[in-house]
Amino acid sequence: MIRGIGIDIVEVNRISDMVDKWGERFLNKVYTPYEVNYCKFKSNTYECLAGRFAAKEAFVKMLGTGFKHIYFKDIEVRSDEKGKPYLRIKGNADRLTKESGIKRIHLSISHERKFAIAFVVGEEG
């Protein structure tokens, strides 16, 4: 049974502007080293980062909590061997997920030159 859904769309330029303005400070606040490294070697680095930002926003919308007591880096977007994205969560994000009865999290990310979008579904049992 579905316990929550979340969706978010991000302008790629918003992320590239933040990286240009704040550099490592922004990257280190929002992304894990894995995420930065993964996106750094992509030809579409900013689209990749924007997709991960959208996924984090969609996740907290799915939980219904927003970022209250959750850090961006508590939500990590990883990719399996086929490139399919999935979430690795920790800290308060993990605790709140468990308290909500969510056992499985599904993630889809799409991006193009101007926008990135992410959709998250939380499922019980």
Swiss-Prot record:
Location in the cell = Cytoplasm
Q: Which cofactors are required for activity?
A: Mg(2+)
Reactions that this protein is recorded to catalyse = apo-[ACP] + CoA = holo-[ACP] + adenosine 3',5'-bisphosphate + H(+)
Write down the EC number.
2.7.8.7
- InterPro entries per the record? 4-PPantetheinyl_Trfase_dom (IPR008278), 4-PPantetheinyl_Trfase_dom_sf (IPR037143), ACPS (IPR002582), Ppantetheine-prot_Trfase_dom (IPR004568)
UniProt keyword ATP-binding present = no
Q: Which GO terms describe its molecular function?
A: holo-[acyl-carrier-protein] synthase activity; magnesium ion binding
NCBIfam families attached to this UniProt entry: acpS, pantethn_trn
Q: What's this protein's function?
A: Transfers the 4'-phosphopantetheine moiety from coenzyme A to a Ser of acyl-carrier-protein.
Identify this protein by name. Holo-[acyl-carrier-protein] synthase
